[in-house]
Amino acid sequence: MPRLHHYLSNQAFLVLLLFSSIASAAVVEHVLHIQDVVVKPLCKEQIIPAANGSLPGPTINVREGDTLVVNVINNSTYNVTIHWHGVFQLKSVWMDGANMITQCPIQPGYNFTYQFDITGQEGTLLWHAHVVNLRATLHGALVIRPRSGRPYPFPKPYKEVPIVFQQWWDTDVRLLQLRPAPVSDAYLINGLAGDSYPCSENRMFNLKVVQGKTYLLRIVNAALNTHLFFKIANHNVTVVAVDAVYSTPYLTDVMILTPGQTVDALLTADQAIGKYYMATLPYISAIGIPTPDIKPTRGLIVYQGATSSSSPAEPLMPVPNDMSTAHRFTSNITSLVGGPHWTPVPRHVDEKMFITMGLGLDPCPAGTKCIGPLGQRYAGSLNNRTFMIPERISMQEAYFYNISGIYTDDFPNQPPLKFDYTKFEQRTNNDMKMMFPERKTSVKKIRFNSTVEIVLQNTAIISPESHPMHLHGFNFYVLGYGFGNYDPIRDARKLNLFNPQMHNTVGVPPGGWVVLRFIANNPGVWLFHCHMDAHLPYGIMSAFIVQNGPTPETSLPSPPSNLPQCTRDPTIYDSRTTNIDLSY
C-alpha cells in the first residue's frame, strides 16, 4: 500500500504540473503593419519599409510555452516575408518565413498570419524580413521570458532593456542589391545614430539607470552585413545567454555579435554617478582588406542624479580588425550545464559533413563590365556549389507535394577537391574549377532524429572573412573553433563535449573552422546560409530536408490554407543580376 500511495502521489503531481503548464501558456496576438514610411536618421529623409511605423519595429514579448499569432499586413510596395530568427518552429515549418524556401512572399496589398508555439526556448531572439535587403529596416526583438512562476537562472534584474543595432544607408533600400557589400553611412542603436554623425548630435539612445541596480540588456545585432563590437565605458557586463540559450555567467568588458546574433547581459550600475558612453564598432574580419576609418556609434548611460553638464566617459574600443578579441569572446561562451532547457551533447554521430565555404567567381556576361577579381562577378559557395533560389514555387511546397524539377537532393558531404583551404593558389585546372563554383539548387536529405556533425571550413579562394552561418529550425552545439585547416585527428581531440554553447548563428573564423553538431528532430526544409545579406545573392547557402519520423506527431503537417501563392518574384536573390557596375 505505501508503494501504491507513493505512485498515485507522483501521478497526481505530474497531472497538476501538466495543468499548471497549460494554464501558464497563453495565445499572444500581434499585428505588423508593413508600410513605407519617411525617416531621417542622418541628414536626408528616406522612404523605408517599416513595421508599425517604427525603426526598429516593435518588440514582441512572449513566455515559453505560449502560442504566438502575428498577422502581417503588407501595405508596402515590396514583397515581404517575416522570419522568426532562432525559433525552433517544431512541426510549424510553414511559419518559418524563409522566402521561396518555406513560403512564397506576401505581395503588396495582401496579408498572412503566422502562428506557432514557443517551446523549449527562453531569452532574446529577433524577427526580420527575409526578402532581399528588407531586413535592413524590417526587424525587431523577440523576447521570450520563462513561464509564469519560473525564475531566471540568475538574480532578477531591476529592469530589462532591448538594445537593437542597425546598419543604415542614406539611399533607397532597393539600390542595396545593385552593388556588392556597399559601405553603410552609419550604424544605429535603437534607431538613433548618436553624436558621432552629422544631423544626429541630439538624437542618441539614452539608458537612465539607478546606482546600485542591475539591468538585463537584451542585445540584438540586426545589422545587415556587419559583426559589431559593443562596449560600455568603465563598466563590465555579465553575459548570461547567447542566441536565447543560457550560458555560464561570463564577465567581460567587450562583446561581439555577428549579424543575427543576440546576447543577454547583466549590467550593474556600480560606478560613480555620471554619464557613460556605450558604443558599437564594426569588426572588419576580411584578411588583406584595408581597414576604413570608422566612427563608433554611441548611446549614453545616464545615472540618476547626473548633472546635465557632466562629460560622458568614453570606452576604449578594439581596433576594427581585432581578431584576437573577437575570438576570445566567442570561444569563452559555454552553456549553463543543468540550466533550463539544457541538454547534453549527443556522443553518437550518424552523419558527418565537411563543408568548405567562401567567395569565388562567376563568369561576367559578354559586353558587361563586372567589378569582381579578374573582371568577373563575385559568387559564393558551400562545397563548391552556388545555391540558386527557386522562382516558381517554394522548396517546402515542392517537397511536400513531390513536385520535381525544383531542387536536387545531391548536396555532397565533402568538397569535390581537397586543397590547402587557407592558402589557395591558382595553379591547375582543378584550382580554376574551385574558383568558379557550380550553380545549382542542391540540398541535403537527413533522416529524422539523426545526429549531424558539420565541420565548416573557411577558404581563401577570395579574401577570407568571418561568415556568420545561420541554421533555420534548430540550435546546434558549437564544439570548437580554430584557425588554419581543420585536422580531423589533432583538432577533434580538442572539441568541447561537456558544456559547448548552443547557437543558431555562428561566425566561422577567417582562415579557420568551426565544428557544429545538432539533432535533426524537426521535419521540413530548413535553410542554412550566411547571415550577411550581401552574400545571399552570391549563393553561400544550402538547405537541409529533414525527413518525416515514424508517427503523425513526427511528420510534416499540411500547409495552411491561406499560404501565400507564388508569382514570379523579381526580388528573388539571383547573383546574375548583381555585381554589375551600374554608374548613376
UniProtKB/Swiss-Prot annotation:
Pfam families: Cu-oxidase (PF00394), Cu-oxidase_2 (PF07731), Cu-oxidase_3 (PF07732). Cu cation 4 binds at H467, C530, H535. Its cofactor is Cu cation. Cu cation 3 binds at H130, H472, H529. Cu cation 1 binds at H83, H470. It comes from the Eukaryota. Coiled coil: none annotated. Residues 1-25 form the signal peptide. This is Laccase-8. The gene is LAC8.
